[in-house]
Amino acid sequence: MVEMKFAVRPERETPSPPAPPAGYDEPKLFEYPTLVLLLVSVPLFLLTAYGFGWLLWQIQGPEVFATLFAVTETGDSTVLVLDMIDVGLPFVVALFVTVAVHELLHGAVMRYYGQDVTYGVNLAMGAFYAAAFGQFQRREQLFPIGLAPLVSIAIGATPLLAVPVPSIAVTAYMVLVINTTGAVGDLYVVWCLRRMPEGTLMYDVDLRHMYVFEPLDVEV
């Protein structure tokens, strides 16, 4: 008789947060509702793609989309074929550059507030990141930290929709769609922060574990 043994892989322990500072309550684990955010990102993508697409159409006219589609007329019909070579490469470049700049802007604002910033790429999560691990971050500072990439890239890229060079205008359109859709997590954090009392602190242990420390002297 052959005896078979199976090793049970232990569950990964949640890293412990630091002790609460004087005047603060015990920490609470902050978690992203990943599935909900993925679902919300779909209509956000569609709304953003339509909104900036409409703006691009109004500024440049339909001719700008000739850089995206090859038009073939056959008899009484017109066929639009998406050129994956001319569109795919700029999209991939725009994706990586936008994500990298997005995180650099997060980090720039963190540094402005005197925080030590760690940049990196997490292949398991498929994400670039900028984080202030092992440091308390004030609620009031996290608003500009969270919104800086969304606002800055929108301000910088929107005027490029009017550049009379279709490849530049279309790339700017891609950047706007990617950046706005990718900010869904930032928008969720900002929404949560608005519901927290002034003086609240947040603390990143690692990429997956963030803790919230609320002050004890909160007036109800």
Q: Can you name each region flagged by the protein language model?
A:
Residues 74, 79, 86-87, 129, ...:
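Generic, low-specificity signal for short hydrophobic/alpha-helical stretches with a mild N-terminal bias
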Residues 81-100:
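Short pre-active-site segment immediately N-terminal to the catalytic Zn-binding motif
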Residues 2-60, 125-220:
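Metalloprotease/metallohydrolase-associated module, dominated by Zn2+-dependent proteases
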Residues 98-115, 149:
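Active-site recognition of the HExxH zinc-binding catalytic motif
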Residues 81-84, 106-114, 131-139:
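Short juxtamembrane and helix-loop transition motifs at transmembrane-helix boundaries
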Residues 108-121, 191-194:
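Membrane-water interface of transmembrane alpha-helices
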Residues 62-83:
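Perimembrane loop-to-helix junctions flanking transmembrane segments
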